[in-house]
Amino acid sequence: MKFLILLTEGIGLRNFSMTRFLSLLCGEGEVVIWHALPEQIGHVHDHPFADRLRWQSMPEHHEGQLPFLFRRAKLIAQLYWQNEAGTETVLKRTTLRGKGVYKLRNRLAEALGRACGRSHNQILWLDDMHARAVRQSRYFVDFLKFLNLERPDVVFCTHQRSPLAVPAMLAARQLGIPTATFIYSWDNLPKGRMAVHADYFLVWSQHMKDEMRNYYPDVAEERIFVT
């Protein structure tokens, strides 16, 4: 079996590559770590299964204006749709600052999020628009090419809130490769921090599974696993 692991930031590196996780996977087959980290990171640890483990840098890419707009609007819409106590506080804490075009972009995302926060169907529309914007980016074809060449049995994202993982997950799903992601923290669900979508979701507890079903009713119960 061939596993492809997405590592886009230090949190995933700490939680997975510095634990027994990689050893367990290497015992089952080949592992490719597709990362957006400094190149020397892959050589830090002398892994006992080095012959089954390969580090590969992702294509250089940055989140464009449209992908950011729809991702940010989706987060805000999710908070308004939940309409829970503390929503305004969370919004204030996540308010982005900027000047010129960035200030305009942030305000537009907030306005769009407020307008689409009335129903879950509108949030799904934002999610679809976000995916379309990423697929139309100039770097998306590079992700398709790499995954088509590697053809892993599963793509696992170590952190569901990372925008850098979005093109890889979308490319995998477009090619029919099963995908899974880990919900990093219990408070990521009520905060609307879901940049990537996957075929399967891994959570910490039954309570998190129940919250996942509540906040994301489009995700069937059999797609959520308690680890």
Annotate each PLM feature.
Residues L4, T89, L144-S162:
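Short N-terminal targeting/anchoring amphipathic segment
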Residues L6-T19, A85-V90, C157:
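A short, glycine/small-residue-rich beta-strand->loop->alpha-helix junction that serves as a flexible
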Residues E9, L37, H159-R161, S185, ...:
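Helix N-cap/beta->alpha junction signal
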Residues L25, V32-H35, D199-S205:
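A short beta-strand/loop micro-motif in the catalytic core of glycosyltransferases
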Residues V32-F140:
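Conserved N-terminal ligand/cofactor-binding loop architecture of enzyme catalytic domains
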Residues R135-Q136, V196-T227:
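A nucleotide-sugar donor-handling region in carbohydrate enzymes
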Residues K145, N188-Y200:
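Membrane-proximal helix-turn-helix segments that form the acceptor-binding/catalytic region
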Residues V154, T158-H159, P167-S185:
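Active-site proximal beta-strand in glycosyltransferases
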